[in-house]
Every structure is written in structure tokens, then in C-alpha cells.
């Protein structure tokens, strides 16, 4: 069963250094971009330069950097879905040394009254995907680190936000009435497709 997939007692057969060589240390922070519009805006408006590339047989993902105040921040356009988004973060970490990843994107609301007109800051993610079970011990939810730090940031700037559980799923086509109701009963206010896996891989590394 998938809940038996967490194995820290033996070494992985495939390692990133086999493909990319030694880990690099180029930047500390990296933005994970889902929106092609935002991605293209950043490339157009900032003096960006390519610092790395995630390689894949169906197309490579360039990783860019831009200067912001006295920092250099990396960013890239991420693939969608838990396995790809989380795996890409692991590769970007290896290629650039980035250890602080800022990820934001869209989602589906499960509670319009709570979320309408607000930024959603997840506190926990239901693990309705597969990747997280390889990187974290099996349990229904995974805690989202730094959610309270983000809430303080939003509060100081008087930005509308709400905190709550979210549901990470691998298939929006199987968000059935019964499953939606069950997640809502557990306190989920939104549904998306990446967070549980991304948090698990970040915690692991």
C-alpha cells in the first residue's frame, strides 16, 4: 500500500548528483511561479538572467534570477501537480542552493464565505496525492510551516487573508460530492494540487 512507501532505512538508487554533479550555492530564495502571465511579466520588467536549467525529455525548465533591493532571487515557471512541482523544487534546490521557496497560485474554494476576496494561507494540507508518502510518515494531513509568519506579514500590511486547512488532490475530476463534503467537515476551505507533496519534500530535504 502507498502508506508503506516511506523508507529512510535504505539509500535511493537515483540521486540528483548523478545528473547535475555537485550541489551549487547561487541563491538563497526562489519564487515558484504557476502563472505564465506573472512569469512573462517578470522576465519583461526585471533584468533577469538564466542561472540553471531543470532538464527533462519533454522540455527543460529554465531557472532565472533577478536583483531585488540587495538580494538576488531566483524564479521559474513550475509544472502543475504534486509530483512534478515538488520534484522540480528538489532539483532547483540542488542546482541553485535555494533553501527558501515562496510558492503561490490559484485554487478552488470549498468555503466561499470564508475565502471570498481573501488570500488563503494554508495551515495543513490533506494528503490526497501520492508523492508525500515517499517523503513523510503516513498520516492524513501535513502541517504547513511558516503559515503564522505569513499571517503576520499579511496582517502588518493590512492584506485580507484567511488561514485554514486545504485539500491536495491528484485529480480534480474525482472531487466527488461525498469527498468534498468530507474534506469540508474536516475544516478544509480550499482544494489545490501541489501543497502536500511540496511541503513533504521541503521538510525531507
PLM regions: where:
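Short, conserved beta-strand edge motifs with alternating hydrophobic and charged residues
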Residues: 103, 122, 162-169, 192
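Glycine-rich beta-alpha junction loops
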Residues: 35, 108, 167-171, 197, ...
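Active-site rim beta-loop-alpha module in soluble metabolic enzymes
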Residues: 140-185
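A C-terminal functional module that forms or caps the active site or interfaces directly
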Residues: 178-182, 189-205
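Metabolite-binding pocket within alpha/beta catalytic cores that recognizes anionic/polar moieties
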Residues: 1-144, 148-149, 204
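A generic structural signal for alpha->beta connector loops
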Residues: 70-72, 98, 158-163, 187
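A structural motif corresponding to the C-terminal end of an alpha-helix
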Residues: 69, 153-161, 198, 205
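Short alpha-helix boundary/capping motifs
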Residues: 82, 144, 173, 191-192
Amino acid at each position: 500500500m502507498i502508506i508503506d512507501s516511506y523508507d529512510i532505512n535504505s539509500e535511493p538508487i537515483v540521486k540528483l548528483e548523478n545528473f547535475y554533479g555537485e550541489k551549487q550555492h547561487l541563491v538563497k530564495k526562489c519564487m515558484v511561479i504557476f502563472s505564465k502571465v506573472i512569469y512573462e511579466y517578470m522576465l519583461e520588467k526585471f533584468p533577469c538572467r538564466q542561472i540553471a536549467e531543470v532538464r527533462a525529455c519533454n522540455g527543460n525548465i529554465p531557472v532565472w534570477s533577478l536583483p531585488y533591493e540587495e538580494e538576488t532571487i531566483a524564479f521559474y515557471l513550475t509544472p502543475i501537480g504534486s509530483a512534478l512541482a515538488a520534484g522540480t523544487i528538489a532539483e532547483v534546490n540542488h542546482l541553485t542552493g535555494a533553501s527558501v521557496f515562496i510558492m503561490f497560485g490559484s485554487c478552488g474554494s470549498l468555503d466561499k464565505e470564508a475565502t471570498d476576496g481573501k488570500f488563503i494561507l494554508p495551515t495543513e494540507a490533506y494528503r490526497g496525492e501520492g508523492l508525500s508518502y515517499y517523503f513523510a510518515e503516513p498520516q492524513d494531513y501535513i502541517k504547513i510551516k511558516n503559515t503564522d509568519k505569513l499571517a503576520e506579514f499579511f496582517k502588518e500590511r493590512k492584506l485580507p487573508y484567511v488561514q485554514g486547512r486545504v485539500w491536495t488532490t491528484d485529480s480534480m475530476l474525482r472531487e466527488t460530492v461525498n469527498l468534498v463534503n468530507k474534506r469540508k467537515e474536516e475544516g478544509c476551505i480550499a482544494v489545490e494540487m501541489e501543497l502536500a507533496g511540496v511541503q513533504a519534500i521541503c521538510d525531507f530535504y
